[in-house]
Amino acid sequence: MILGIDTSNYTTSVALVDDDGKILKDCRQVLPVKKGHRGLRQSEALFEHIRNLPELMHTVIGDQPIKNALKAIGVSVAPRPIRDSYMPVFRAGTGIAEILSDAIRVPYYRLSHQEGHIRAAMCETEIFSWQHQLDANWQRQSEPMLAVHFSGGTSEILYVKREKKGFQCKIVGRSLDLHAGQLVDRIGVMLGMDFPAGQALERLANPLQTAPLKLATQVVDGDFHFSGMENAAKQSLQKGEEPANLAYALFEAVGRTLGRAIIALLEKTEVSAVLFSGGVMANEIVKEEARKRIFAFCRSHRRPVSLCFAKPQYATDNAIGCALLAKEAFEAEQKKACND
């Protein structure tokens, strides 16, 4: 068995997978945010993780004979797989992993939250293809792809290649101001919803098939802006726009922005697959608008491509990706040791 731990800005997550990669346990606890507030300070989030971890760890491994069965631990130690990437919240999970690793003498692998998102998104995907067929083992292939990570703390498009441990990630598109999840939560809180507001805002928008309101988007060479949408949304509300119209227009604009950014990057790269992860990518309106726009480009340019959308349970923050990456890194080390 392999244990995964992730302590992100807003969710404490612990997962356990078996030697075949089957998910045995997946436990998560969303951190509480006071009504009317738009987030947590790092110190507040760190405290909540420290409070949540003992109970989640007991739920995941309390009845498991881990002393002889646990082979490795994977833990997110930073937001991104780049030098100097750091947030205090990840110290909570890292500390638990280090203690457990020393106590039962198993290796632990230092991973990033972003890599965990990418790997978890590969677990189960909804794949839409235009004249392109993904190999059955595409999750393990080394061919580069684009990976979208849209959440409350990140809005990036990455050029990704598999490595022996985790992924090599290069940012090729990103928000130059607000993150997509920040935008959604700010508008939701403005409408009186609890933080995080994504699901409640989507429920408000879902009954609409079209909306009379359209928010402008700004995309340049794969980079984009969301702050203008926030200002436009505030102005619309002040003018008496219906909240349901605004909710739909907001998600439609995020999807349109993402679609335009992906198209700009497809024009500059040779990739044939795009993976979508992060909590915002669980939104059906965002997914549909991005897919529709990208496929229109593919048809007109005869560009084969597959769009792989993570199922909602794998799109949001979790520790499954860390567990699976640790499993694969452990297996690679074992194979190398046998060959040597």
Task: Please provide the spans of the model-predicted regions.
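Short glycine-rich phosphate-binding loop at a beta-alpha junction
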Residues: K67-A78, E270-M281, C308
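Short beta-strand-loop/turn "lid" adjacent to the catalytic site in phosphate-handling enzymes
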Residues: I61-E98, D102
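A short helix-loop
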Residues: T7-S8, L24-D26, Q139-E143, H149-S151, ...
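Glycine-rich phosphate-binding/hydrolytic loop that grips phosphoryl groups
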Residues: H117-A120, C308-D340
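Conserved phosphate-binding catalytic cores of ATP/NTP-utilizing and phosphoryl-transfer enzymes
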Residues: V106, R110-M145, L325
